Amino acid sequence: MNWRTRFSAAEKKVDIVVIGTILKEIVHFPDGREIGPVIGSPVAYSSLVMAAQGVNVGIVTYYGGDMPEIIGELDMLDRRNMMPWEHTTTNMLMYREDGTKYINYIKKAPPIRYRDICRAFRACRYFKICPMDYEVEPKLARRLYREGKTVFVDLGGYGGATSDVRYSVEDAYGYKVVSTLCKNSTIVKASQEDLASIVPGRTAEEAARYLLELGARTAVVTCGGSGAFYSQAGREPVWFRPFKAVSEEANGKLDMTGAGDSFGGGFMASYIQNGDINAAMANGNCTASLVIQRSGGCTFKRMPTRERIARRAATGE
């Protein structure tokens, strides 16, 4: 497909720009099952989630010619800022019995800088920054925030569960990165697992409070089966219970791959409508509960529609 002609002049306005690397990924489960190679990464999951909910998503990433059979999963995104490279970032995603994960990187694409964002995308109001392993420079977030953009940053790729070397705030480099991002974003998001590496030795609520002390306006934290909460200065954390998820797979198991990224996508799909954080939290939880009912990696057909989410939110179905 010719991506330079796919979008007419009237279609070139995007609702949100998502920035970070995409992955050529093999997912390994504790029971020995493997799927892949599939497209993975926070960018891919959250972008497809938002697209399924009717959001026009622009993506800024590098990609190689090494996965022609699966790159088509991104066909419903505005891909004109996908930059060709000699290879796609390639990895093995390994899940442990307790649900935590680690990643073995095989190949990596280059870092993403502000100058890599095309002019049309720079005009967008909303940006979601969600790297895997520090590949999006923190000063990119600072530049966007100072331009008055609404900037959502997923900290998982800045020392959290997807990072190769996990620099915590106890390291000079880790502190500089996290404090820069907190000061130059509208919302920061992390999982409880991410925060165990980024802000070690603290509970999730304590870690969120620490992020606020570094300058974050709002800190959103996902906590698996316990739900999710957000913290803001001068307020107690506001918790949201998870929605009940029932597997649609023959083996009866939920697939947690992409759960946190799907929450982030569902959150932003709602947030860009009216800036209502409570509605966004509920939409994020509802979205994630539906995604984990299906397996198969990061595919558009796995992602719930706005109508399906509304039905679960209303009835629990």
Model-predicted regions and their roles:
Residues Y126, C130-R209, S226-G227, A233:
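Conserved beta-alpha-beta core of the PfkB/ribokinase-like small-molecule kinase fold
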Residues M1-P30:
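Positively charged, low-complexity intrinsically disordered leader regions
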Residues L48, N91-M94, G227-S231:
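Short beta-strand scaffold segments in enzyme catalytic cores
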Residues N2-K13, G174, A204-E317:
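Conserved phosphate-binding/catalytic region of the ribokinase-like
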Residues K13, K24-P37, A52-C130, E135, ...:
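Conserved N-terminal subdomain of the carbohydrate kinase-like
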Residues V17, G58-V60, F152, I187, ...:
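A structural signal for isolated positions on well-ordered beta-strands in alpha/beta enzyme cores
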Residues E11, F121, S179-C182:
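A short, aliphatic-rich alpha-helical micro-motif
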Residues S47-N56, S270-Q273:
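Alpha-helix C-terminal capping segments
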